[in-house]
Amino acid sequence: MIKVPAYMYVLECSDGTLYTGYTTDVKRRLNTHNTGKGAKYTRARLPVKLLYSEAFNSKQEAMRAEALFKQKTRQAKLTYIKQHKNEQ
């Protein structure tokens, strides 16, 4: 069986807030958000843009990373993104 990578992603909404989620296809999910068919949170804050995505070996790992990321303060999230973007 072929393993499909899963991704944690972070969006910046039109009001400047951040939204974090997970998916197996970042481009498709971003499009879903921007067409108003994504999460209720982003529907009211369109358009959204992708700030960051990180690949994981499984959906479970991506979900765990998402949960941990959501616990961070906004500043800690932005610092994480800045530090890890340089690694990609």
Swiss-Prot record:
SUPFAM superfamilies: GIY-YIG endonuclease. InterPro entries: GIY-YIG_endonuc, GIY-YIG_endonuc_sf, UPF0213_domain. Transmembrane segments: none annotated. Residues 4-80 form the GIY-YIG domain. Pfam families: GIY-YIG. Belongs to the UPF0213 family. This is UPF0213 protein SAG0778. It comes from Streptococcus agalactiae serotype V (strain ATCC BAA-611 / 2603 V/R).
